[in-house]
Structure formats: structure tokens, C-alpha cells
From Swiss-Prot:
It is an enzyme of class 2 (transferase). It comes from Geoglobus acetivorans. GO terms for biological process: farnesyl diphosphate biosynthetic process; geranyl diphosphate biosynthetic process; geranylgeranyl diphosphate biosynthetic process. This is Geranylgeranyl pyrophosphate synthase. It comes from the Archaea.
Length: 319
């Protein structure tokens, strides 16, 4: 059911992306900037924005610019993240910097970042609410950068605690889903308690989503549209790895950059055998349950129920 709702709302998002984010001159820059947008994706963040607007009893079309702005920010972060991580694949296509070069990819990300705020400013809402929304999205972008820096700095350290990992994930992934869920409450001038509850729904959903994403990196071989096992090879301190290290597990391929499939499979088996994978799954589920509890402040409706189902979907998807 929820997958059909996601597809339906994503269709609206894609149509608006076509309208607002056209290719233009200089062609080389905009081809790079639109590369991931054209590659598709589930559009989960803008779908959450539209469903949140509906759950608040508002016309979702009045939140469409905010939804596109958030998807544009998301794509800007992907372009820059892929440069830093040196990933070659994303969404089943070559990464922007691989195709267009690093200088153009940096400019493409910067362009998307600026376009996001331009699009948000077009929202059909009172000017003072738009200003608040712009301010909140700007703060989210700062926190995303902080989270990305934390993630990179963890790679240089021998050990990272679970609480540090969760704070990094809250910033790198959680806050963008937090603003996705709460920005309609800002634009429509809803009560602060409603805005806060939707923010928390998004934050907790985002943490659960990221933990599940880390799980997919070692279990979603051939499905996730990026390099399988790349987190291990890059030396990323995911919750799974943190737990495995606590259990005294040694991973031969961790942070090595390259390894044979056989070596990688041996290390991944260790993560399953020591209980680290099951532990991460349990933690992801806990965060999703916390997310859903925050929706209780909103009157029951089909759209609220869709948000509940979507939270479950975030940790049940296979890609």
C-alpha cells in the first residue's frame, strides 16, 4: 500500500522537478547538476513533506515548492558526499564527479544548494512563514555539513562510541528528514507543539533510515545502486562496526579501500555471527517506534496513517 502512495506522490514531485529544474546554459554545468535528479530515486523526503501537509489538513500543492527545495538540498549533499567518499556509483548510475570531473561536480552541488532556497521562496504561504522556513532549512544545511565532517573525522579515529555515531547520524541524515516532515507546519503557521512533533518524527525516522542503510551496505548486494560493502572498505564507523569492535571482532578489509569479494564476504559474515547486525536492526526498529509515537499529536487521517506506514517502510526496504 505505502509503496503505491510513495510512487503516486513521487510522480507529482518528478513533474514539478521537470518544471522548476530545467537544463539550461551553460549546458555542462546543468547536465551535471541534474544528473541524479534524472536518475530517479524514491523521492522519500519530498513525499514526506506532501504527506505531512495533507496530515495537517492542508492542500499538499501549497507545500510542493518546499518539497522540491528539500529534494534539491538532498541532491546537493549527494554530489558533494560522493566526491568526498570517492564513490563511483549512485542510484545505479555513475557519480557526478566520475562523469563530469571534480571541479564541475563541486559547482553542480553549489548550484543545487542555491536553487533550493530560490525554490522555497516561491512557496504559497505568508512571507513571514517563508522566512522562518528558509531560516530553518539553512540551519539544517549547516547541521548536515557538521554531520558529514563528523563522519569523515570518525574514519581517522580508532574508536567511536555509539552515542557519537547517533549524533552524527542525527545531523547527517536525521535533520533533513526532520525538516521534510515539519516544514509544512512552519509554512502553514501551525502550533509549535505540532511542528516539534513532526520534526521529531523526521529525526527519529532519519536515524532508523540511516541504520537500515548501513545494514543494506552489507546485505543488499546488487540492489542498492552503489558499491557493495563500500562502507567497510572506506573504514566507516557504522553502528554495526562499532558494535562488532566492542565485541572484539577484527575486520581484515576495514578501511583498506580495496579487497577481493571473498575477503569482504568473510568480514561481513563476522558481523552477522557476532550479533552486530541483529543489534543494529533492533536499534533501527526502536527509533522508528519513537518516530511513530510523535504522530499522535495529529488527528487520525489516511495521510497520518501513511506517515506511520512510511516510517515502517524506511527500515523494511531492500534498496
Amino acid at each position: 500500500m505505502i509503496s503505491e502512495i510513495i510512487k503516486d506522490r513521487a510522480k507529482l514531485v518528478n513533474e514539478k522537478i521537470e518544471e522548476l529544474l530545467k537544463e539550461q546554459e551553460p549546458e555542462g554545468l546543468y547536465r551535471a547538476a541534474r544528473h541524479y535528479l534524472k536518475a530517479g530515486g524514491k523521492r522519500l523526503r519530498p513525499v514526506i513533506t506532501l504527506l505531512s501537509a495533507e496530515a495537517l489538513g492542508e492542500d499538499y500543492r501549497k507545500a510542493i515548492h518546499a518539497a522540491i527545495a528539500i529534494e534539491t538540498v538532498h541532491n546537493f549533499t549527494l554530489v558533494h558526499d560522493d566526491i568526498m567518499d570517492e564513490d563511483e556509483m549512485r542510484r545505479g548510475v555513475k557519480t557526478v564527479h566520475t562523469l563530469f570531473g571534480i571541479p564541475t561536480a563541486i559547482l553542480a552541488g553549489d548550484t543545487l544548494y542555491a536553487e533550493a532556497f530560490e525554490i522555497l521562496s516561491m512557496s504559497d504561504a505568508p512571507p513571514e512563514n517563508i522566512v522562518r522556513a528558509v531560516s530553518k532549512l539553512a540551519r539544517v544545511c549547516v547541521e548536515i555539513c557538521e554531520g558529514q565532517f563528523m563522519d569523515m573525522s570518525f574514519e581517522e579515529r580508532d574508536s567511536v562510541g555509539e552515542s557519537e555515531y547517533l549524533e552524527m547520524v542525527r545531523k547527517k541524515t536525521g535533520v533533513l528528514i526532520g525538516i521534510s516532515a515539519s516544514i509544512p507546519a512552519v509554512l502553514f503557521g501551525k502550533d509549535e507543539s505540532v511542528e516539534k512533533a513532526l520534526w521529531n518524527y523526521g529525526i527519529y525516522s532519519g536515524i532508523g533510515f540511516q541504520i537500515h542503510d548501513d545494514l543494506l551496505d552489507i546485505s543488499g548486494k546488487g540492489k542498492i545502486g552503489k558499491d557493495w560493502g563500500s562502507d567497510i572498505l572506506e573504514g566507516k564507523k557504522t553502528l554495526i562496526v562499532i558494535k562488532a569492535f566492542e565485541e572484539g571482532i577484527e575486520l581484515e578489509t576495514f578501511g583498506k579501500g580495496r579487497a577481493s569479494e571473498e575477503e569482504l564476504e568473510r568480514d561481513i559474515k563476522k558481523l552477522f555471527d557476532c550479533g552486530a547486525v541483529d543489534y543494529a536492526r533492533e536499534r533501527a526498529r526502536e527509533y522508528i517506534e519513537m518516530a511513530k509515537k510523535n504522530l499522535e499529536v495529529i488527528d487520525e487521517s489516511p495521510s497520518r496513517n501513511y506517515l506511520v506506514e512510511l516510517a515502517d517502510y524506511l527500515i523494511e526496504r531492500d534498496h
